[in-house]
Amino acid sequence: MERPMARSLEGRRAFSHRKSYKGQKHTVIGAISIDGLVCIKAIKDSMKGENFETFVSKNLCPKLSKGKVVVMDNLKIHKSEKVQQMITDTGAKPLYLPRYSPDFNPIEMLWSVLKSFIRRFKPQTSFAMQQVLRIFLLVLNKSFFKNWFAKCYYCTS
């Protein structure tokens, strides 16, 4: 989030080359498919293992079924036995990408577009951040997801 005020000499406009103020931290976690957004959740802090496990059990697993594949990077919390077990219990299969391979992960493109969308609107409060996220979700359409999967070398037909 952006700082709402700044200091300067009287009669002079405040100017800064680089933002040095860090606002409140927000973390967004989600899952996508070629058909669109599967689930998404915003957290007002850093992601912790228990937050991810809760997301998987309450948001992701109810939408999984036999034959689905959950593609994740090699983040430690993604590879926990509890998360793997929750996913396999639904009949889905967890699949882990090689290290340092965001080019094969379509959700990285979603995060990139979301970050630029947030930078453009510059929300200054948590409420404004939630509103920007809601608007972003309304703007997304199925063609975005299909193109992101195609760009990551997944079969889209």
Regions found by a protein language model. Give the residues of each.
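Extended, low-complexity cationic-aromatic segments
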Residues: M1-S57
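Short, basic/hydrophobic alpha-helical segments
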Residues: N51-V69
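C-terminal anion-handling pockets and recognition modules
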Residues: I107-S157
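RNase H-like two-metal-ion nuclease catalytic core shared by retroviral integrases
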Residues: M72-N74, E81, L95-R119, F127
